[in-house]
Structures are given as structure tokens and as C-alpha cells.
């Protein structure tokens, strides 16, 4: 593709999505952790400006959801809830409350999951919220004043 660079995702499915502003970040454990990513499996995916970052987060969450062993409730149920919210957002049916719940679920999984998969599954969501928040906001359906 001839598109312009938008983001790089490091560390495999539970790594973070890093915007162009951080391209000069050294690829080491500490530096990646400072910007919300991980070294993980050492994978690197490069995305151009045609990439929908909310859908990217949904794609990686679906993978983590499918790979969850189901032993702990935070990961087993949390990844399903997060995937459902991301799917609604991608379809343009999400709400601001969905985004707030997504952030709460990210914190819950990181703090309470028993293994590395559950603890790192929120990384793509957290980094896309941090660096591409406007894409989430653009997907929120028009809400009536309540």
C-alpha cells in the first residue's frame, strides 16, 4: 500500500499500538512499557492511514477472547464484554458510556487477571484510546440529551 504510516503494533496480540510520534522509541522492555506497549512475542505490525484503530483494537481483543483459558472470571468475561463493546463501536452503535465501561474493564483485567494474557489483553485498547481517542469519539452514535 501507498498509504501514510499511522501506527505500529508491537509485541503480538496483546501489545500496544504506537503512533508516529513515538517511532524513535527504542525497542526494549522499559521504553515500550513507558508508552503502553510490550516486547511480547517480538511481533511488529505496521498500519497505514486507512486502518481503523477501533477495529484494530477489536481484532486483537477477539484474539485474546478466543485464547482465554477461562480459568479466571476477569479474563473470561471481561474479554467478551470488551469485544462486544468494541464491536458496537465499530458498527457506529456505541455510546460514551461504552467507552467509559471499556476503560473500567481494561483496568479490571490488568489488575485482577491471573495470567499474562488477561493482564496484557487490554493493551491494544488502552493504547488506541490514548493515542487515537478521536477515532473512538467519532464512532459514538448521536445521543439525545438526557
Regions found by a protein language model. Name each.
Residues 1-146:
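Redox cofactor-anchoring modules in respiratory/redox and cofactor-processing assemblies
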Amino acid at each position: 500500500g501507498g498509504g501514510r504510516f499511522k501506527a505500529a503494533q508491537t509485541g503480538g496480540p496483546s501489545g500496544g499500538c504506537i503512533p508516529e510520534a513515538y517511532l524513535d522509541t527504542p525497542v526494549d522492555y522499559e521504553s515500550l512499557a513507558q508508552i503502553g506497549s510490550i516486547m511480547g512475542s517480538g511481533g511488529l505490525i505496521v498500519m497505514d492511514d486507512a486502518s481503523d484503530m477501533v477495529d484494530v483494537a477489536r481484532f486483537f481483543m477477539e484474539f485474546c477472547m478466543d485464547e482465554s483459558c477461562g480459568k479466571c472470571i476477569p479474563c473470561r468475561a471481561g474479554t467478551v464484554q470488551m469485544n462486544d463493546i468494541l464491536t458496537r463501536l465499530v458498527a457506529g452503535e456505541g455510546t460514551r458510556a461504552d467507552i467509559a465501561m471499556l476503560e473500567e474493564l481494561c483496568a479490571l483485567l490488568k489488575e485482577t487477571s491471573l495470567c499474562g494474557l488477561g493482564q496484557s489483553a487490554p493493551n491494544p485498547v488502552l493504547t488506541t484510546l490514548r493515542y487515537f481517542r478521536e477515532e473512538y469519539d467519532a464512532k459514538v452514535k448521536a445521543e439525545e440529551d438526557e
